[in-house]
Amino acid sequence: MEPDGPEGVESDVGAFDAFYLAFSTALGGSDEPDMAGVRIGRYELLEEIGRGGMGAVYKARRADGAFEQVVAAKLLRRDLGTEALHAQLRNERQLLAHVDHPNIARLMDGGRAPDGRPFLVMEYVEGTPIDRYCQERGLNTDERLDLFLTVCEAVQHVHGHLVVHQDLKPRNILVTPGGRPVLLDFGIARLSELDVGVAEESPA
């Protein structure tokens, strides 16, 4: 089934597996089979790079011949296929599709896999978790504050689109080799609440 998310994104993106640690370790493991080699919508899943309680994250590539593109595909578990979760995922995807900010990882596409499971296609970001970046680069207090303020501006921007992260932590913020912090995984924490018995909250 063709995805129903935003189309026509032609920019090249980098690759760094640490981007997906937050998603793949947030809620534990699962017994889902490896889907490498399967095509979902316009994308072929190349290799699994993370797995967690909500599903798995794959390195993927655009496979419809339109252009070359490497992305991250987040595929939900089969047993999380409740209508409430699907509806929430659609809502989050629609909100995130309108977010365009240099310090927020872009939602690029989304839809349902051949077996009916929802998936998200996200920008593949090259970078280092912000805490490790600061330590490895030996940043002083002013330099760290500059990064922090940039992150705050990105959070403020996305809040203006009625999206709340709810899981901000160092491994959800990568800093690119050029020093640009990028926020990751908006909406994922909220989605997990719907299937683990936690009351749903309205976006603030």
Task: Indicate residue ranges for each PLM-predicted region.
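Low-complexity, Pro/Ser/Thr/Gly/Ala-rich intrinsically disordered linkers and tails that serve as
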Residues: 1-27, 141-142
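Conserved ATP-binding/catalytic core of the eukaryotic-like protein kinase fold
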Residues: 25-204
